[in-house]
């Protein structure tokens, strides 16, 4: 399946607003401002197999994952750019799995910004039969954000990777 289009973000009444990603690591800041509408192309290629979907381009993100609020702020559903990268969705009688890499920025030699990507895993292990009236699950959620790169020349020791996770029953 192929999908294409345009993603638009426009704050009515705002003439200037920061183009900062509020979900990032604290030291990684954007200093630019945007005016008018924020337009991005949208493209998704999806291959569906028996119990696995492979998605490339704009991936299914945001609230589709069911991440807990400390890992994903629901306000980002309205303000964040669409996630782009690669995603694996799998479903079986004993597990639901969503694994992805959201590539926010790549770098070339002598770029003035860092490469940035987020890797995530959201799973739900099912402990009893799907036909059961009572269900017991063990969720596992992991989110890692990386900033830096092999050819990053901005400053020394500027590579950062932060990881957080949640397990429950």
Outline where the language-model segments fall.
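Short loop/turn motifs that connect adjacent beta-strands in outer-membrane beta-barrel proteins
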Residues: 2-4, 48-51, 94, 126-139
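Outer-membrane beta-barrel translocator/channel fold
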Residues: 39-42, 50-81, 132-169
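Residues that define the transmembrane beta-barrel architecture of outer-membrane proteins
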Residues: 1, 35-41, 80-84, 113-119, ...
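Beta-barrel outer-membrane channel/assembly domains of diderm bacteria
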Residues: 1-37, 41-47
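Outer-membrane beta-barrel translocator domains and adjoining extracellular loop/strand segments
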Residues: 14-23, 66-73, 109-116, 149-156
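Transmembrane beta-strands of outer-membrane beta-barrel pores
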Residues: 6-12, 49, 58-63, 92, ...
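Residues on the lipid-exposed face of transmembrane beta-strands in outer-membrane beta-barrel proteins
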Residues: 1-2, 41-47, 86-92, 121-125, ...
């Amino acid at each position: 399946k192929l999908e294409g289009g345009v993603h638009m973000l426009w704050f009515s009444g705002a003439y200037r607003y920061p183009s900062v990603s509020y979900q990032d690591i604290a030291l990684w800041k954007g200093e630019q401002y945007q005016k008018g509408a924020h337009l991005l192309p949208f493209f998704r290629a999806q291959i569906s197999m028996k119990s696995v979907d492979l998605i490339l381009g704009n991936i299914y993100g945001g609230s589709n994952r069911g991440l807990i609020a400390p890992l994903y702020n629901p306000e980002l559903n309205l303000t964040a750019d669409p996630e782009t990268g690669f995603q694996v969705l799998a479903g079986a009688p004993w597990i639901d799995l969503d694994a992805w890499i959201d590539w926010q920025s790549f770098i070339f030699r002598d770029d003035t910004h860092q490469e940035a990507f987020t890797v995530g895993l959201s799973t739900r292990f099912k402990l009893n039969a799907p036909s059961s009236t009572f269900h017991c699950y063990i969720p596992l959620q992991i989110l890692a954000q990386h900033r830096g790169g092999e050819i990053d020349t901005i400053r020394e020791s500027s590579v950062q990777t932060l990881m957080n996770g949640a397990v429950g029953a």
